[in-house]
């Protein structure tokens, strides 16, 4: 059997949710609605971050990057999934599969790193308020954003390269998109060495950022407890709790998928877990981080009234 870059010229078959045909129409409706709302919500955040000068702050700078990531991240898999659920075409070309694997891993890895940067930004705002603007100056913000994107794409390049070097036995991918654990399941040769290399990269990109975020929020919680106002503490803990919910869903599902042994990985369960970080998290991010925020609501009304007056 040849290696991935010479095998299966006709591509792969994505099994998707065809094992549950009665579930496919329901999934199609819900996923289509969630995808539409994700596009709408994240596009609004990006537009407002550019249009309203009051949102030209470090926090909204990173949030606009997160929204762009979520737009691209969900678009790298969901359109293919919707086609799959319709049963029109369950195939994907070899080149398309490689491109999807690379883009998906790059964007997912970038989001893992960017969420750490955003946690650091919140830590600086809450725990070092007097020095916040000095710490989070524009040059540092741009550097951190570029570093996040760079780290994500480097990680994806490494893991995609390792995947392409594996010989595969079969062309049926028991998933709704080209995901790494499914390729490892198809590998003909012993993948222990490849798995070890991938595991190190995943610990750096997934586990370490998750630990850093939790550490940041421990410091934030400690600072909030010193706030004398009960209402202020309640508001701060409510915000932190919402942020941690997104972190838990995103990193929890990613850890389940990427940090367990391939021998313990269940393809049937993996498909449903993947829905959390491909469908659920991208729609929660704009709702939790920004659309409930008074500044964002004010900016949105300002833009809407400006458009109404000009009309």
UniProtKB/Swiss-Prot annotation:
Instruction: Show the GO MF annotations.
Output: G protein-coupled receptor activity; olfactory receptor activity
Q: Which UniProt keywords apply?
A: Cell membrane, Disulfide bond, G-protein coupled receptor, Glycoprotein, Membrane, Olfaction, Receptor, Sensory transduction, Transducer, Transmembrane, Transmembrane helix
Which segments sit on the Extracellular face? Answer: 1-25, 80-100, 159-194, 259-271
Q: Show the disulfide pairing.
A: 97-188
Q: Coiled-coil intervals in this record?
A: none
- One biological-process term from Gene Ontology? detection of chemical stimulus involved in sensory perception of smell
Instruction: Answer whether the UniProt record assigns the keyword Cell cycle to this protein.
Output: no
Q: Which InterPro entries match?
A: GPCR_Rhodpsn, GPCR_Rhodpsn_7TM, Olfact_rcpt
Q: Where in the cell is it found?
A: Cell membrane
Q: Where are the transmembrane segments?
A: 26-49, 58-79, 101-120, 140-158, 195-218, 236-258, 272-291
CDD domains named among the record's database cross-references: 7tmA_OR2Y-like
Q: Which Gene Ontology cellular component terms are annotated?
A: plasma membrane
A Pfam family that this protein carries is: 7tm_4
Membrane topology is: Multi-pass membrane protein
Q: Which residues are glycosylated?
A: 5, 264
Record keyword Cytoplasm present? no
Which of the residues are on side Cytoplasmic? 50-57, 121-139, 219-235, 292-311
Q: What does this chain do?
A: Odorant receptor.
Q: Which family does it belong to?
A: Belongs to the G-protein coupled receptor 1 family.
Q: What is this protein called?
A: Olfactory receptor 2Y1
Q: Which organism is it from?
A: Homo sapiens
This protein's gene is called: OR2Y1
């Amino acid at each position: 059997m040849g290696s991935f870059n010479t095998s299966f010229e006709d591509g792969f078959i994505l099994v998707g949710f065809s094992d549950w045909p009665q579930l496919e129409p329901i999934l199609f409706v819900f996923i289509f609605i969630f995808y539409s709302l994700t596009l709408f919500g994240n596009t609004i955040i990006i537009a407002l971050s550019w249009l309203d000068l009051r949102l030209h702050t470090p926090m909204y700078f990173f949030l606009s990057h997160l929204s762009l990531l979520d737009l691209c991240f969900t678009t790298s898999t969901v359109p293919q999934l919707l086609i799959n659920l319709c049963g029109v075409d369950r195939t994907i070309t070899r080149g398309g599969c490689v491109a999807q694997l690379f883009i998906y891993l790059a964007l997912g890895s970038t989001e893992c790193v960017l969420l750490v940067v955003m946690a650091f930004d919140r830590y600086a705002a809450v725990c070092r308020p007097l020095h916040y603007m000095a710490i989070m100056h524009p040059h540092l913000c741009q550097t951190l954003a570029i570093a996040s994107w760079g780290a994500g794409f480097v990680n994806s390049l490494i893991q995609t390269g390792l995947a392409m070097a594996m010989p595969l036995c079969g062309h049926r991918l028991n998933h709704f998109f080209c995901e790494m654990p499914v390729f490892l399941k198809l590998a003909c040769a012993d993948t222990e060495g490849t798995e070890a290399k991938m595991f190190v990269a995943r610990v750096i990109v997934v586990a370490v950022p998750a630990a850093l975020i939790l550490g940041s929020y421990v410091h934030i919680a400690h600072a909030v407890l010193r706030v004398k106002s009960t209402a202020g503490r309640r508001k701060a803990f409510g915000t932190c709790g919402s942020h941690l919910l997104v972190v838990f869903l995103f990193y929890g599902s990613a850890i389940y998928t990427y940090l367990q042994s391939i021998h313990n990985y269940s393809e049937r369960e993996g498909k449903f877990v993947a829905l959390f970080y491909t469908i659920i998290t991208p729609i929660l991010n704009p709702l939790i981080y920004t659309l409930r925020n008074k500044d964002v609501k004010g900016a949105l009304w300002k833009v809407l009234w400006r458009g109404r007056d000009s009309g």
